[in-house]
Amino acid sequence: MNKVFGTKGSHWRKLDNAAKIFPATSNKKDTRVFRFYCELKEPVDGSILQSALDKTIDKYPVFLSVMRKGFFWYYLEKSDLKPKVKEEVDPPCLNLYIRDRKTLLFQVVYYKNRINFEVFHALTDGTGAIQFLKELVKNYLILRYRDAALPDISFTEEDMTLQDQESDGFSKYYSKTEGRQGKKASSFQISGPRTGYGSLNITEGLVSCQALLKKAKEYGVLSLIHISEPTRHS
Protein backbone atom coordinates (compact mmCIF):
# COMPACT_ATOMS: atom_id res chain seq x y z
CA MET A 1 0.00 0.00 0.00
CA ASN A 2 1.36 3.44 -0.87
CA LYS A 3 2.31 5.82 1.91
CA VAL A 4 0.43 9.02 2.62
CA PHE A 5 1.68 12.34 1.26
CA GLY A 6 3.30 14.48 3.91
CA THR A 7 4.85 11.46 5.64
CA LYS A 8 8.47 10.37 5.41
CA GLY A 9 9.23 8.34 2.29
CA SER A 10 5.88 9.00 0.62
CA HIS A 11 6.06 9.70 -3.11
CA TRP A 12 2.79 8.62 -4.71
CA ARG A 13 -0.83 7.71 -4.07
CA LYS A 14 -3.47 6.01 -6.15
CA LEU A 15 -6.62 7.78 -7.32
CA ASP A 16 -9.81 7.01 -5.48
CA ASN A 17 -12.57 5.25 -7.39
CA ALA A 18 -14.57 8.38 -8.18
CA ALA A 19 -11.49 10.15 -9.62
CA LYS A 20 -10.30 7.44 -12.01
CA ILE A 21 -12.53 8.54 -14.89
CA PHE A 22 -11.31 12.15 -15.08
CA PRO A 23 -7.73 11.81 -16.46
CA ALA A 24 -8.88 9.56 -19.30
CA THR A 25 -11.85 11.71 -20.33
CA SER A 26 -10.56 15.27 -19.93
CA ASN A 27 -9.87 17.35 -23.04
CA LYS A 28 -9.88 20.96 -24.21
CA LYS A 29 -13.64 20.92 -24.60
CA ASP A 30 -14.30 19.35 -21.21
CA THR A 31 -11.35 20.08 -18.94
CA ARG A 32 -12.87 18.47 -15.81
CA VAL A 33 -11.83 21.62 -13.95
CA PHE A 34 -14.20 23.40 -11.60
CA ARG A 35 -14.01 26.66 -9.69
CA PHE A 36 -14.99 28.03 -6.29
CA TYR A 37 -14.42 31.64 -5.35
CA CYS A 38 -14.75 34.06 -2.46
CA GLU A 39 -15.54 37.72 -3.06
CA LEU A 40 -14.19 40.19 -0.52
CA LYS A 41 -15.27 43.76 0.19
CA GLU A 42 -11.97 45.21 -1.04
CA PRO A 43 -9.37 44.50 -3.75
CA VAL A 44 -7.20 41.43 -3.20
CA ASP A 45 -3.51 41.95 -2.40
CA GLY A 46 -1.62 39.43 -4.55
CA SER A 47 1.51 39.24 -2.39
CA ILE A 48 -0.50 38.56 0.77
CA LEU A 49 -2.56 35.97 -1.07
CA GLN A 50 0.68 34.22 -2.08
CA SER A 51 1.77 34.05 1.56
CA ALA A 52 -1.65 32.71 2.52
CA LEU A 53 -1.41 30.04 -0.19
CA ASP A 54 2.04 28.97 1.01
CA LYS A 55 0.64 28.50 4.50
CA THR A 56 -2.43 26.64 3.25
CA ILE A 57 -0.33 24.18 1.24
CA ASP A 58 1.49 23.16 4.41
CA LYS A 59 -1.82 21.79 5.67
CA TYR A 60 -2.81 20.15 2.37
CA PRO A 61 0.43 18.68 0.90
CA VAL A 62 -1.48 16.37 -1.45
CA PHE A 63 -2.33 19.43 -3.57
CA LEU A 64 1.34 19.61 -4.61
CA SER A 65 1.02 16.34 -6.52
CA VAL A 66 1.09 15.88 -10.30
CA MET A 67 -0.74 13.33 -12.44
CA ARG A 68 1.23 10.40 -13.82
CA LYS A 69 0.22 7.46 -16.00
CA GLY A 70 1.37 3.94 -15.24
CA PHE A 71 0.96 0.79 -17.33
CA PHE A 72 -2.59 0.21 -16.14
CA TRP A 73 -3.73 3.25 -14.18
CA TYR A 74 -3.20 6.90 -13.36
CA TYR A 75 -1.75 7.96 -10.04
CA LEU A 76 -0.70 11.11 -8.17
CA GLU A 77 3.01 11.69 -7.64
CA LYS A 78 4.61 14.01 -5.12
CA SER A 79 6.33 17.01 -6.70
CA ASP A 80 8.54 19.92 -5.69
CA LEU A 81 6.50 22.42 -7.73
CA LYS A 82 5.38 25.56 -5.94
CA PRO A 83 2.04 27.21 -6.75
CA LYS A 84 2.19 30.84 -7.84
CA VAL A 85 -0.70 33.24 -7.37
CA LYS A 86 -1.59 35.18 -10.52
CA GLU A 87 -3.96 37.94 -11.45
CA GLU A 88 -6.71 36.53 -13.64
CA VAL A 89 -6.37 37.19 -17.38
CA ASP A 90 -7.57 33.90 -18.95
CA PRO A 91 -11.07 32.42 -19.29
CA PRO A 92 -12.16 30.27 -16.34
CA CYS A 93 -11.51 26.54 -15.98
CA LEU A 94 -8.89 26.05 -18.68
CA ASN A 95 -6.88 22.82 -18.82
CA LEU A 96 -4.89 22.13 -15.66
CA TYR A 97 -4.09 18.51 -16.44
CA ILE A 98 -1.94 18.40 -19.58
CA ARG A 99 -0.84 14.91 -20.58
CA ASP A 100 2.88 14.18 -20.39
CA ARG A 101 3.58 17.49 -18.65
CA LYS A 102 4.48 17.93 -15.00
CA THR A 103 2.01 20.56 -13.82
CA LEU A 104 0.07 21.21 -10.64
CA LEU A 105 -3.60 20.31 -10.80
CA PHE A 106 -4.93 23.49 -9.22
CA GLN A 107 -4.40 27.22 -9.39
CA VAL A 108 -5.25 30.32 -7.35
CA VAL A 109 -5.95 33.52 -9.27
CA TYR A 110 -7.53 36.79 -8.24
CA TYR A 111 -9.54 39.49 -9.97
CA LYS A 112 -10.42 42.74 -8.24
CA ASN A 113 -12.18 41.65 -5.01
CA ARG A 114 -12.40 37.96 -5.90
CA ILE A 115 -10.20 35.02 -4.92
CA ASN A 116 -10.64 32.14 -7.38
CA PHE A 117 -9.67 28.54 -6.70
CA GLU A 118 -9.70 26.17 -9.69
CA VAL A 119 -8.90 22.46 -9.44
CA PHE A 120 -8.84 19.35 -11.62
CA HIS A 121 -11.59 17.04 -10.44
CA ALA A 122 -9.29 14.03 -10.03
CA LEU A 123 -7.38 15.85 -7.29
CA THR A 124 -10.35 16.58 -5.04
CA ASP A 125 -14.11 16.86 -4.98
CA GLY A 126 -16.31 19.82 -4.11
CA THR A 127 -16.07 19.23 -0.37
CA GLY A 128 -12.27 19.16 -0.43
CA ALA A 129 -12.15 22.25 -2.64
CA ILE A 130 -14.38 24.22 -0.27
CA GLN A 131 -12.24 23.20 2.70
CA PHE A 132 -9.11 24.35 0.88
CA LEU A 133 -10.66 27.68 -0.14
CA LYS A 134 -11.94 28.38 3.37
CA GLU A 135 -8.48 27.71 4.79
CA LEU A 136 -6.92 29.95 2.12
CA VAL A 137 -9.29 32.85 2.76
CA LYS A 138 -8.87 32.50 6.52
CA ASN A 139 -5.08 32.67 6.21
CA TYR A 140 -5.37 35.65 3.87
CA LEU A 141 -7.54 37.63 6.29
CA ILE A 142 -5.27 36.81 9.24
CA LEU A 143 -2.23 38.07 7.31
CA ARG A 144 -4.10 41.05 5.86
CA TYR A 145 -5.35 42.25 9.24
CA ARG A 146 -2.54 41.33 11.61
CA ASP A 147 -3.49 44.04 14.11
CA ALA A 148 -7.03 42.69 14.42
CA ALA A 149 -5.78 39.45 16.02
CA LEU A 150 -8.32 37.35 14.12
CA PRO A 151 -8.84 33.83 15.54
CA ASP A 152 -7.16 30.94 13.72
CA ILE A 153 -10.33 28.89 13.29
CA SER A 154 -10.05 25.21 12.36
CA PHE A 155 -12.39 24.06 9.58
CA THR A 156 -11.57 20.38 10.04
CA GLU A 157 -11.91 18.02 12.95
CA GLU A 158 -9.10 18.51 15.44
CA ASP A 159 -8.06 14.84 15.24
CA MET A 160 -8.16 14.64 11.42
CA THR A 161 -4.99 13.05 10.04
CA LEU A 162 -3.40 13.10 6.59
CA GLN A 163 -4.87 9.62 6.10
CA ASP A 164 -8.33 11.07 6.77
CA GLN A 165 -7.74 13.82 4.19
CA GLU A 166 -6.87 11.23 1.55
CA SER A 167 -9.52 8.62 2.42
CA ASP A 168 -11.60 7.17 -0.43
CA GLY A 169 -15.16 8.12 0.44
CA PHE A 170 -16.48 6.35 -2.68
CA SER A 171 -15.25 2.96 -1.46
CA LYS A 172 -16.51 3.64 2.05
CA TYR A 173 -20.05 4.78 1.26
CA TYR A 174 -20.94 3.42 -2.20
CA SER A 175 -23.72 0.86 -2.29
CA LYS A 176 -24.70 -1.32 -5.25
CA THR A 177 -28.32 -1.25 -4.11
CA GLU A 178 -30.39 0.22 -6.91
CA GLY A 179 -32.68 3.08 -6.04
CA ARG A 180 -36.24 3.44 -7.18
CA GLN A 181 -36.34 4.20 -10.89
CA GLY A 182 -38.83 6.97 -11.57
CA LYS A 183 -39.68 8.73 -14.78
CA LYS A 184 -37.22 11.53 -15.47
CA ALA A 185 -38.29 14.88 -16.82
CA SER A 186 -36.76 16.11 -20.06
CA SER A 187 -33.89 18.55 -19.61
CA PHE A 188 -34.20 22.15 -20.67
CA GLN A 189 -32.40 22.84 -23.95
CA ILE A 190 -30.41 26.08 -23.98
CA SER A 191 -30.67 27.99 -27.25
CA GLY A 192 -28.62 30.79 -28.76
CA PRO A 193 -25.04 31.13 -30.05
CA ARG A 194 -22.52 28.72 -28.57
CA THR A 195 -19.40 29.71 -26.69
CA GLY A 196 -16.16 29.18 -28.60
CA TYR A 197 -14.52 25.76 -28.43
CA GLY A 198 -12.69 25.13 -25.17
CA SER A 199 -13.74 28.32 -23.37
CA LEU A 200 -16.30 29.36 -20.77
CA ASN A 201 -18.09 32.57 -19.95
CA ILE A 202 -18.97 33.97 -16.55
CA THR A 203 -22.39 35.59 -16.38
CA GLU A 204 -23.15 37.79 -13.39
CA GLY A 205 -26.41 39.52 -12.57
CA LEU A 206 -28.16 41.48 -9.85
CA VAL A 207 -31.65 40.76 -8.61
CA SER A 208 -33.84 42.19 -5.89
CA CYS A 209 -33.66 39.97 -2.81
CA GLN A 210 -37.29 40.68 -1.94
CA ALA A 211 -38.47 39.83 -5.47
CA LEU A 212 -36.44 36.62 -5.45
CA LEU A 213 -37.82 35.51 -2.08
CA LYS A 214 -41.36 36.33 -3.20
CA LYS A 215 -41.03 34.25 -6.37
CA ALA A 216 -39.43 31.35 -4.49
CA LYS A 217 -42.30 31.43 -1.98
CA GLU A 218 -44.79 31.16 -4.84
CA TYR A 219 -43.15 27.87 -5.82
CA GLY A 220 -42.81 26.73 -2.22
CA VAL A 221 -39.03 26.34 -2.40
CA LEU A 222 -35.93 27.95 -0.91
CA SER A 223 -34.40 30.83 -2.86
CA LEU A 224 -31.24 28.79 -3.59
CA ILE A 225 -33.32 25.99 -5.13
CA HIS A 226 -35.24 28.51 -7.21
CA ILE A 227 -31.96 29.85 -8.64
CA SER A 228 -30.12 26.57 -9.19
CA GLU A 229 -32.93 24.32 -10.45
CA PRO A 230 -33.06 25.71 -14.05
CA THR A 231 -29.30 25.19 -14.36
CA ARG A 232 -29.47 21.66 -12.99
CA HIS A 233 -32.02 20.66 -15.62
CA SER A 234 -30.20 22.32 -18.53
Predicted segments with their positions:
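Flexible, P/S/T/G-rich "lid" or insertion loops adjacent to the active sites of thioester-utilizing
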Residues: G169-V221
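Non-catalytic N-terminal regions of enzymes
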Residues: M1-Q165, L213-K215, R232
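Alpha-helical scaffolds flanking conserved acidic
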Residues: I115, V221-I225
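Single conserved hydrophobic/aromatic residue that forms the stacking wall/gate
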Residues: H226-S234
